[in-house]
Amino acid sequence: MPNWLKKQMQKAFLEKDNYQIKLLNQCWYFYRKKHCS
């Protein structure tokens, strides 16, 4: 996981920002799919 994404994730979890967490999860999912396939 890239550093910027980790930071965003931690921030979202600290603020209990569910919308942001969902968004970042999708972002990470697509990122992984793109780089792994």
Curated annotation (Swiss-Prot):
One example of a Gene Ontology biological process annotation: sporulation resulting in formation of a cellular spore
Entry keyword annotation includes Transmembrane helix: no
InterPro entries registered for this protein in UniProt: CmpA
Domain of life: Bacteria
Any one GO CC term of the record: intracellular immature spore
Disrupted gene: phenotype observed: Deletion mutants produce heat-resistant spores more quickly than wild-type cells, but are sensitive to lysozyme.
Keywords of this entry: Sporulation
Upregulation: Expressed during sporulation and is regulated by the mother cell-specific transcription factors sigma E and SpoIIID.
Entry's localization field: Forespore
Main localization, broad class: other
Quaternary data: Can form a complex with SpoIVA and ClpX.
Other remarks in the entry: Overexpression causes defects in cortex maintenance and cell lysis.
Protein purpose: Ensures proper spore envelope assembly. Represses premature cortex assembly until coat assembly successfully initiates. Also participates in a quality-control pathway that selectively removes defective sporulating cells through regulated cell death. Acts as an adaptator that delivers SpoIVA to the ClpXP proteolytic machinery for degradation, specifically in cells that improperly assemble the spore envelope.
Protein name listed in UniProt: Cortex morphogenetic protein A
Protein's gene: cmpA
